[in-house]
Regions:
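Nucleotide-activated sugar donor-binding and catalytic core shared by glycosyltransferases
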Residues: 1-429
């Protein structure tokens, strides 16, 4: 019965791909137009390589969805190197921002992941000949898993987690269907005990509790000359960075900063939106005509707001900021990871929504390294910022607590790498 359901599912999935394949070029063309695909690398989406591979070396394949998951994958890649893995590391992902992120790490090969049609996935695996597939978090594509197993690859899920919404949806598929899928995974390293329990309820058997790899990524290098020039333009204002903001959040934050400045707090807001193509729309909020980096350059002392819309900027901005507001948290977007700014000894605030990073948020709050708001009200945002500005001892304690946590997190990636290498010794033979 289980085998029948699995065969039935794969046949249905293959049939879906048969129907939609003629429309894939239109989808790719549309994504090129809206700036979400690199035209010179389109062939990667169909499993063709855009670079070479030394077949003499072992190759670990880390698959991630977008920027957040690629940060986890990069963290694990560094962990493998620290654990004395000598082979190649390939990261696949689906977004331009994630591809750009990997350029900071010379030992990593990046390719856009093939779309999940069996023919294209098989073509990809046939060329790259990976020794293992490690899926980051929960970016599970059926043919990615099935084809990898057909090629005899071990499959691991690292930093594994499932949102409540996805968990409910998967439970509705039925236990036997999800069990058949997850039992093709040789090892699941969940981010916490709650996540481990979710995978067990879906029929997975080989589950261990580890931690999130996102929090173990070391800070990237900063451009001190650029930071100094940016600071000179802003002058002596208190700098707040709104990091990875989502639609609707910028208006609330801009209103809050305007009210703070009416109270003579002399605050400057840098907005770094999660999706940089929204920069023009953000610049028009409250008819402010906010300067955008890509068009207008750096801010001056006459500005109170500035939009950073270029890639590879966050480490510089975290280093510059006195206070960081973590976006995706004022409305139910799940919240973005608040751990990264801890490495830069800044003060961190986020909104009430943290469904996607509850464990990290809980740890940071328990260590007094994070202010989490109870609502998205402007008054609460203003009060939190004022507390940091006025209470110097409180402000200092926030920074110190975050910095201590960041140092402890750096060990996680190597510990997880050792677990995987111990489980699959062929990777080091």
């Amino acid at each position: 019965m289980k085998l029948f359901k699995l065969v039935n599912f794969t046949k249905s999935y293959d049939l879906i791909w048969l129907v939609i394949t003629p429309f894939v070029p239109l989808l790719i063309f549309y994504r090129i137009i809206i700036g979400k695909e690199e035209i010179l690398r389109i062939k990667e989406r169909f499993g063709y390589p855009s670079t070479t591979r030394n077949k003499k070396d072992k190759l670990i394949w880390l698959h991630a969805a977008s920027l957040g998951e690629v940060a986890s994958a990069t963290s694990l890649a560094i962990g493998f190197k620290k654990a004395n893995y000598k082979g190649l590391i390939l990261i696949t992902s689906g977004t331009k921002t994630s591809s750009e992120f990997t350029k900071n790490y010379k030992d990593i090969i990046h390719q856009y992941h093939p779309l999940d049609k069996k023919k294209w996935v098989n073509r990809f695996i046939s060329f790259w000949e990976p020794d293992i597939l490690i899926v980051m978090e929960s970016d599970i594509w059926p043919n990615l898993i099935f084809c990898s197993k057909n090629f005899g690859l071990p499959v691991v899920m690292a930093s594994a987690q499932i949102s409540n919404k996805s968990f409910t949806r998967m439970k509705n598929l039925g236990f036997s269907s999800t069990a058949n899928l997850f039992n093709k995974v040789d090892l699941i390293l969940a981010t916490d005990k709650t996540q481990s329990e979710k995978f067990l309820q879906l029929g997975a058997k080989k589950v261990l509790t580890a931690k999130s790899l996102k929090i173990s990524l070391p800070p990237q290098k900063t451009d001190q000359l650029y930071i100094e020039n940016l600071r000179k333009g802003i002058s002596n204002k208190i700098i707040i960075l709104a990091a990875s903001t989502r639609e609707g959040e910028e208006s609330i934050l801009i209103n809050s900063i305007q009210k703070l400045n009416k109270k003579n707090h002399n605050v400057f807001l840098i907005i770094a939106p999660r999706h940089i193509q929204r920069a023009n729309k953000i610049s028009k909020i409250n008819n402010l005509n906010i300067k955008i980096k890509s068009k207008d350059g750096l801010p001056s002392s006459y500005d109170n707001f500035w939009i950073s819309n270029t890639y590879g900027e966050m480490s510089n901005l975290y280093s510059l900021a006195d206070i960081v507001f973590v976006g995706g948290s004022l409305y139910p977007f799940g919240g973005h990871n608040p751990s990264e700014p801890c490495h830069y000894k800044t003060k961190i605030i986020m909104g009430p929504h943290s469904e996607k990073c509850q464990d990290i948020v809980r740890e940071m709050k328990n260590s007094n390294a994070l202010i989490q708001l109870n609502s998205n009200s402007e008054d609460e945002i203003i009060n939190s910022i004022e507390k940091i500005i006025i209470n110097k001892d409180f402000s200092k304690s926030l920074s110190i607590a975050g910095s201590k946590l960041a140092k402890s997190w750096l060990k996680i990636k190597t510990n997880i790498a050792y677990k995987i290498l111990k489980k699959f010794p062929l990777l080091v033979s």
